[in-house]
Amino acid sequence: MTGTPDVFPPATPGGTPLVALPAGPRKPDQVKGKLYIKTHGCQMNEYDSAKMADVLAASDGLELTDSPDDADVILVNTCSIREKAQEKVFSQLGVWKSLKNKGREVIIGVGGCVASQEGEAIIKRAPFVDLVFGPQTLHRLPELIRARREQKRPQVDISFPEIEKFDRLPEPRADGASAFVSIMEGCSKYCSFCVVPYTRGTEVSRPFEDVVVEVAQLAAQGVREINLLGQNVNAYRGPYGDGEFADLGLLIRTIAEIDGVGRIRFTTSHPLEFSDSLIDAFRDVPQLANFLHLPVQAGSDRVLSAMKRGYTALEFKSKIRKLRAVRPDISISSDFIVGFPGETDADFEKTMKLIEDIGFDHSFSFIYSRRPGTPAADLEDTISDAEKHARLSRLQERINAHAAGISEKMVGTVQTVLVEGPSRKNPNELTGKTENMRSVNFPAPARLIGQFVDVVITEALTNSLRARVVAE
């Protein structure tokens, strides 16, 4: 590889667990090569990876492969939330370097948040990398690949062209009964520990009608569950009409009217903007799943203030109380950070108290990871690694125990599941998801795949439920 990387000029400045099926990749009309994509991180990255596949299938005739050894183009879609995830990327790139050493003319590209954060530094650290592109420029992949091949030097484009990428993506293609739909990009909250505003930009909402059209297209292809995505999805303000804006509540109500849409989810939310309008949608829209992922991060007001979260523990509990007034049995999951700089034993106990008060379902919890460039990176860390791990273990044990209790209480109840396909454990059975994100395995005919089915829960296991189909 020769020369220095070309850096595309910046465009107009612009401008996450719970698993769902992403929109399926587009099949090329004529296969001209193989594409391999490795995805790290959140559901937004899963969505973006599916769109990368769609774009390159439409433009370059690339078909997805499960093996990088067979690929003509290899892409890694990265996450920079934690240092460990970031280092995994460079480790993976080192493995792929050997493919080039064998004389293959394979294109290797790095996308996602690490790409946005590191830019040309990736080329300096791994000079065999051909492409570096950000979350907002994945639609430019065909041009980047073409430029790399013609100019014989690496290409870098980590600009923030607002919602241009959505205007240039192919029509969505569904694969399965559930699909992601991104409704906004970026985050403007600037929490002191988080890199997202720096890697994905500030908040930019897609136009209301564009989102509704995409959902309608997916529903027409058999999608029954829509997962609305955004870094701060409940800050959605989609322009529509004559200078008006639609919030997430109105978007949900509109999508629920689309023929075929039987279940709606959204993630990830910020408590600061969990509005009464959204609570009213939970009250009025039966298609809105009886489940909410609402990251709280900590239960100590002092720590929440240091994190720049913008709310208190009491305000968080007040929002949950309002929600449970209209959805008494809703499952609430969350995110927690332990060992944030300056977190005392008393602070941690307040987090444990909040967990008891709310009764969280399955949640995500991590030891604080210092991210360069964030305000929290300059805070003094006086907590030992042993103490951080002890706190994390205790927190996870308590949340897991409560989640297990929720599963046990579901035994004997009738639950509606969206049937996803054959069970991985037993191909003679089917598997599906309940509203509260539990995997359920049950004997049933394959014709039920892609449909909603009522089942009776017969057994609660550690990571799943067993059931039988309710007699028709």
UniProtKB/Swiss-Prot annotation:
Amino acids binding [4Fe-4S] cluster 2: C187, C191, C194
Region ranges (Disordered): 1-24
Cofactor: [4Fe-4S] cluster
CDD domains in alphabetical order: Radical_SAM
TRAM domain location: 408-471
Catalytic activity: N(6)-dimethylallyladenosine(37) in tRNA + (sulfur carrier)-SH + AH2 + 2 S-adenosyl-L-methionine = 2-methylsulfanyl-N(6)-dimethylallyladenosine(37) in tRNA + (sulfur carrier)-H + 5'-deoxyadenosine + L-methionine + A + S-adenosyl-L-homocysteine + 2 H(+)
One cellular component term from this protein's GO annotations in UniProt: cytosol
GO MF: 4 iron, 4 sulfur cluster binding; metal ion binding; N6-isopentenyladenosine methylthiotransferase activity
Manner of cofactor binding, per the entry note: Binds 2 [4Fe-4S] clusters. One cluster is coordinated with 3 cysteines and an exchangeable S-adenosyl-L-methionine.
Cross-referenced SMART domains: Elp3
The protein's enzyme class: transferase
Subcellular location: Cytoplasm
UniProt: [4Fe-4S] cluster 1 binding residues: C42, C79, C113
Record-linked Pfam families: Radical_SAM, TRAM, UPF0004
Family matches, as InterPro entries: Elp3/MiaA/NifB-like_rSAM, Methylthiotransferase, Methylthiotransferase_CS, Methylthiotransferase_N, Methylthiotransferase_N_sf, MiaB_methiolase, rSAM, rSAM_horseshoe
Enzyme Commission code(s) on record: 2.8.4.3
Positions of the Radical SAM core domain: 173-407
Family, per entry: Belongs to the methylthiotransferase family. MiaB subfamily.
Cited function: Catalyzes the methylthiolation of N6-(dimethylallyl)adenosine (i(6)A), leading to the formation of 2-methylthio-N6-(dimethylallyl)adenosine (ms(2)i(6)A) at position 37 in tRNAs that read codons beginning with uridine.
Subunit structure and binding partners: Monomer.
Name the UniProt record assigns to this protein: tRNA-2-methylthio-N(6)-dimethylallyladenosine synthase
